[in-house]
Amino acid sequence: MPIPGVIQPKTIEVSNDIRLRKYDGNYDFAFSWYQDTELVYLVDGDRSPYDMDRLSRMYSYLDAHGELYFIEAKEDGAYRPIGDVTFWQDDMPIVIGDSKYRGRGIGRLVISRLIERGRELGFGRLNVREIYSYNIASQRAFESCGFVRDAETENGFSYYIDLTERKGNMHASDNS
C-alpha cells in the first residue's frame, strides 16, 4: 500500500545505473538473497534462511506499510534486481541482496534519493526503527546521509533525520 494520498512512482532514478522499481508482486528472484545467513542475521538478528512463505509475508507487510521497491542495477544495458527497500516516514528497511553489489555505496545512494523523496512529499522527519548494534555498515550508510542516532533499542539503535534542516545555504543570496 502506497503512502496514503500519494501515488507511488513506477520507477525512481537513483543514478545513471541504479533505479528503484515499484513492487509488482513478483519476488521469486529475491528468494536467493534471503538464503544468505549473514544477510538474514543483519536484517533479522538470527541466521534462519527464509522459506517462500516467510518471504511472501515479509513483502506483504512491507507493501502494506509503505512504498516497496526493488533496487535495480543496469548490467549489459538491462536492469536487474539487486535488493529491496521500503520507504515510509516511520522506517526505511533496505537490503542489498546480491552480494557482489554490497560495499559499493549503492545503499547510500538509495537512502539519499529517498531522503530527497521525503522532502518532495513535505515530510518533516524520517525515522529508522532499528539498526542492530553489530550492523556497522548500515549504521554508517544512514549516518553518512545525515541520519542521527536517536535512541538505544532492544538490539541496537533507532535513527532519524530532520528534513526541515538543510546543510549549508542552498539558495542564492539576496543582494538587497
Task: Annotate each predicted stretch with a short phrase.
Residues 72, 91-106, 131-132:
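A short, internal acetyl-CoA/4′-phosphopantetheine-binding micro-motif in the GNAT/acyltransferase core
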Residues 58-70:
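A short helix-loop-beta-strand connector motif used in the catalytic cores of GNAT acetyltransferases and
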Residues 67-82:
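Conserved beta-hairpin
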Residues 1-49, 53-57, 165-176:
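A short, well-structured alpha-helix characteristic of acyl/acetyltransferase catalytic modules
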Residues 83-90:
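A conserved beta-strand-loop-helix scaffold within acyl/acetyltransferase catalytic domains
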Residues 129-130, 143-162:
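Conserved catalytic-core motifs of GNAT/GCN5-like acyltransferases
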Residues 103-117, 139-144:
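Conserved acetyl-CoA-binding loop-helix of GNAT-fold acetyltransferases
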Residues 128-139:
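Conserved beta-strand-loop-alpha-helix junction that forms the acyl-donor binding cleft
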